[in-house]
Amino acid sequence: MKIPLSNRLLACCGFIKPGERVADIGCDHGYLGIYLLTKGIARSVIASDINQGPLASAVRNSEKYGVRNQISFHLSDGVNNIPRDFDVLVCAGMGGDTMVSILSNAPWLKQDRYRLILQCQSKTPMLRQYLSQNGWQIAQEVVLKDGKFLYTVMAVIWKPSEALSPGECYFPSALLENEHLSAYYKWVITGLETIVNNQKEQANPFAVQALDELRKREQT
């Protein structure tokens, strides 16, 4: 049986290393974990969701695909109620502000034994800024297209280093070259220009700095 996995979730799976123990936060119907297990990629999966309905659906789906005994299910707000015996944590389909809240409430994740795979639906620059200011480093990030929209998936490690500049928060050097990168850059620039031009004197200084930095980068 084919597992109905979006391009976004497939991209997340692409960052999982063989044999890793995976925690899927906000698992929805559980397809990411099911895919990783049926493909022999993950060793085990922890699946959590804040709502009982999706979690019950994920349990049924795991039974349907024959991997129920390899997944532990947990009703949890973020990572508050999950076991800590995993290697990589996946958060997909949430806003950047929600991810910031989850990570802020889990200081125990700040260890080099954990990796994060994050896929934002919105407010990605906010998430990148938070990560870089709180000891996390984006090791790699990839742009993908799902339907009509462009998204990114980032692989994050615990490695305190210099905070990202405003321009890097919008278009980081960790982005991998692929067929969608140019379109993503144009989308970022257009969005920044809209913010700056519409707000004029009241424009967010961070956005102004980011746009100026990226334009200067074009000239080098």
Residue ranges and their predicted role:
Residues 3-19:
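Conserved alpha-helix/loop element of class I SAM-dependent methyltransferases that forms part
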